[in-house]
Amino acid sequence: MSGKTLYDKIWDAHVVSEAGGEAILYIDLHLIHEVTTPQAFAGLRAAGRKVRRPDRTLAVADHNIPTEGQALGVDAVADEEARLQLKTLARNVADNGIEFFPMGDIRNGIVHVVGPEQGRTQPGMTIVCGDSHTSTHGAFGALAHGIGTSEVEHVLATQTLRQKKAKNMLVRVDGQLPPGVTGKDVALAVIGEIGTAGGTGYVIEFAGEAIAGLSMEGRMTLCNLTIEGGAKAGLVAPDDKTFAYIQGKPAAPKGAAWDMALSHWKTFFTDEDAVFDRTVVIDGSALVPMVTWGTSPEDVIPVTGNVPDPESFATPDKRAAAHRALDYMGLKAGQPISEARIDRVFIGSCTNSRIEDMRAAAAVVQEAFLHGRLVAPHVKAMVVPGSGLVKEQAEEEGLDAIFKAAGFDWREPGCSMCLAMNPDKLAPQERCASTSNRNFEGRQGRAGRTHLVSPAMAAAAAIAGHLVDVRTLFSETAQ
C-alpha cells in the first residue's frame, strides 16, 4: 500500500462518515463576509436553527466596503444594497455570538488576509468560506476552498460539509527563482502551463525548491490563484516558515498547547512513497515576470514577450476566444506587451495586499523616486492594504509616505478594485495593471481592461506609464 499525500491525510482526519462516493467532512474554520451570508442566516432563522459552532466562525466586512471614509460608519456607505448587506451581517453575527471585525476595526480587512494574520488559519485544518479564493489558506497546509450560499447555511447549521474527494496533483517548481520573480509570477506561469481547466477535479500540492524558498506571503499568493487553474484547492506542506508565521498571532496556541499543536502540525506532509494522479514540473530558475494579455488568467506571457496571434491557437474555440480577447483588450497580435499604455494601477486584493507586497511595491517606487521619477502623469494609481493591521504596519515603516510622495493614492482596507462591487471601479476601456486575481471581462468595471501582475510589476507600470519589466525599469529611466 502506497503512502498518503498531504491532501489524503487532511481528508482522512476530517471524515465523519462516507456513503455513495461522498463524505461528510468536519469543518474546522468557517470564514464569512457580508455578500454570501444573508440568505444563509435567513435560512437558519426560517428553520429555527442556530449556528452550531460560533467559536469556529469568523466574520469580516470586505467585499462591499468603501476604501475611503470608513470612520463615517456603515450609514455613510453610498450604495443601498451594500449598506443593507453590511447591516445585515452585523445583526446576524450579533444574534449568533460570532466574532466579527466590522468596518473601521483595525483588525478588519479582506477575509483571506485576516484569517492568517489572526492565527486562525493553521496546518491540517479544513477551512471554507463563501468566496472562491479561500484556497489562499492552503499555504499553511490547510484544506481550504470556497463554497456556495446553500453550503454556507449547511456549515453554519452543522459544522460539516458533504464532499466528493478530489484527485491529487503535484506541481513541482524546481530551482531557485531569479531576482524579480515572485509567487505571483509562479502562479501565473502554472496557470499558463495547465490552463484554467487543467486543475479541474484535483487538489494541487505545490512543492520543490522554488516553493520552499517562497515566504508565507508568496505561498498565500500562489495558493490564492489555484482556483484560477480550475483546482478545488491548493496546498503547501507546513514547515518552519509556517510555524514561525503563526507563532505569537492572537489565536495561535500558547505555552504547552503550542508544543502539542506543533507536534500535530508536523505530521502533515506527503509521504515519500505517495502516488499522485498527475505531476507537473516547472523550471523555476527559467521564469521571468509574467503578465496577462487577455481575458482569462491562462492568457499569460512573459513581460518580455509579444501578444500572441489568435491563429496560432490549436482549436477553433481557442482561436475565437483569442480574437475576442484581443478585441476587448484593445491589443494587436504581435505587439510587445510592454507597449501597452496603462491608465490605472491597483495594488491590493486577497492575492497581493500583505505587508510583503506593500514593501515590494514601495521599494520600486522609492528607487524610481531616487531616479527622479513619479507616477506617470496620465496614470491614477492606488494602494489598498489588505487589513487595518497591514495598513498600520506599513505606516509605521513609512511605506505610505513613499507611495503618497510619488503620487499613489493610499487607501483604507477592503477588496476594492479587485471586483466591481464597491466604489473602486475602472471606467470603460480603462487599462489597469492589477495585482488581483481575475482579468475577466468587466471584472474591475464595465468594459475595463485588466492585466494581472505582481506588486513590483504594478508599481513599475505606474512609474513607466505602460507595462514594463521591473528588472529593466531603471535602465529605461536612465535613458
From Swiss-Prot:
Binds 1 [4Fe-4S] cluster per subunit. Keywords: 4Fe-4S, Amino-acid biosynthesis, Branched-chain amino acid biosynthesis, Iron, Iron-sulfur, Leucine biosynthesis, Lyase, Metal-binding. [4Fe-4S] cluster binds at residues 350, 415, 418. InterPro entries: 3-IsopropMal_deHydase_lsu (IPR004430), Acnase/IPM_dHydase_lsu_aba_1/3 (IPR015931), Acoase/IPM_deHydtase_lsu_aba (IPR001030), Aconitase_4Fe-4S_BS (IPR018136), Aconitase_4Fe-4S_dom (IPR036008), IPM_dehydratase_rel_enz (IPR050067), IPMI_cat (IPR033941). Belongs to the aconitase/IPM isomerase family. LeuC type 1 subfamily. Its cofactor is [4Fe-4S] cluster. Heterodimer of LeuC and LeuD. PROSITE patterns: ACONITASE_1, ACONITASE_2. NCBIfam families: leuC, PRK05478.1, PRK12466.1. The keyword Iron-sulfur applies. HAMAP family: LeuC_type1. It comes from the Bacteria. Pathway: Amino-acid biosynthesis; L-leucine biosynthesis; L-leucine from 3-methyl-2-oxobutanoate: step 2/4. It catalyses: (2R,3S)-3-isopropylmalate = (2S)-2-isopropylmalate. Its EC number is 4.2.1.33. This is 3-isopropylmalate dehydratase large subunit. GO terms for biological process: L-leucine biosynthetic process. PANTHER family: 3-ISOPROPYLMALATE DEHYDRATASE, HOMOACONITASE, MITOCHONDRIAL-RELATED. Catalyzes the isomerization between 2-isopropylmalate and 3-isopropylmalate, via the formation of 2-isopropylmaleate. GO terms for molecular function: 3-isopropylmalate dehydratase activity; 4 iron, 4 sulfur cluster binding; metal ion binding. CDD domains: IPMI. Pfam families: Aconitase.
